[in-house]
């Protein structure tokens, strides 16, 4: 293992430890496919422990000593993620109040983290352009109950070299503990407008519209 990979693996270990301390469940992912390397459904209700994480990094997972991480979203970890997989999706999220200060820089966009409200509420996963209760924007997805998101310091590898590292981009005036102040309440309350394009009266063509005259309505 090269020195670069050793440093990255230590950073990933530290990231996993931080997640567990936050009460967030993480699982190992394949570097090549983003697919989980374990049967992970049980961890939607069961705690991922420090001991389990240490075993992954010590012994590997399914013969893999190099792997990425994902955080399980939803009530189990107390978080949800607005997943912007394109710059178009990022711009839409920024215009429509779907962002938070807790940002992960991904390969093509950003992940915005919010606090899951708990109290028995459920927020299912959403895919941009599918369904009526989520904006029809390609690349704008939602990771909620039953989902997961690639977690820092996961990497994208091409030709055996690291092309990108998933990293936190949080303003200096915040830390992850402040996420409790950014509770997700659902798209209806969160977004300014549910449609892809903002409506403007200035865009209407009124050229052939006549002004109202009361005399026109007289018999």
Regions found by a protein language model. Name each.
Residues 73-90, 94-95, 115-219:
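DNA replication initiation modules
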Residues 1-108, 117, 191-193, 197-218:
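Signature for HUH/AEP ssDNA processing cores
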